[in-house]
């Protein structure tokens, strides 16, 4: 089982819901920094996205994370995909935990990573993965 907790009285006081959707060709997704809501850039949208409630999608893929920071000199100043965007994009695009790992890796490779160190716990009914990213 994978879950997510953030022990903060001022952050994460809401439950996120994103419905499943079909997107027209050429649609873009605007990415925002999870901590500051600052726009980071845009990436192409996929043709279909899955429903997400909290940090689990309609296929029971769930993602949690642990921030461990990273060395500042390793951070990618040109990256536009932060850890929060990676979590939601993976949930919207992946039907299994294994697919979520690939979605995250592909997005970071294509668009760069805009956060420090994160450890993602990604599970589905059949398997669980741990993925660490330092940026």
PLM regions with names:
Residues 1-82, 103-135:
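A contiguous strand-loop segment
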């Amino acid at each position: 089982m994978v879950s997510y907790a953030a022990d903060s009285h001022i952050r994460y006081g809401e439950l996120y819901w994103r419905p499943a959707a079909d997107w027209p060709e050429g649609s873009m997704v605007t990415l925002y920094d999870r901590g500051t809501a600052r726009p980071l850039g845009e990436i192409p949208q996929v043709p279909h996205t899955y429903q997400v409630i909290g940090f689990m999608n309609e296929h029971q893929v769930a993602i949690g994370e642990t921030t461990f920071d990273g060395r500042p000199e390793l951070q990618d100043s040109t990256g536009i995909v932060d850890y929060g965007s990676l979590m939601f994009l993976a949930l919207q695009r992946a039907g299994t935990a294994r697919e979520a790992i690939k979605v995250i890796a592909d997005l970071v490779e294509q668009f760069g990573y805009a956060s420090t160190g994160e450890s993602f716990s990604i599970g589905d009914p059949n398997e669980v993965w741990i993925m660490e990213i330092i940026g």
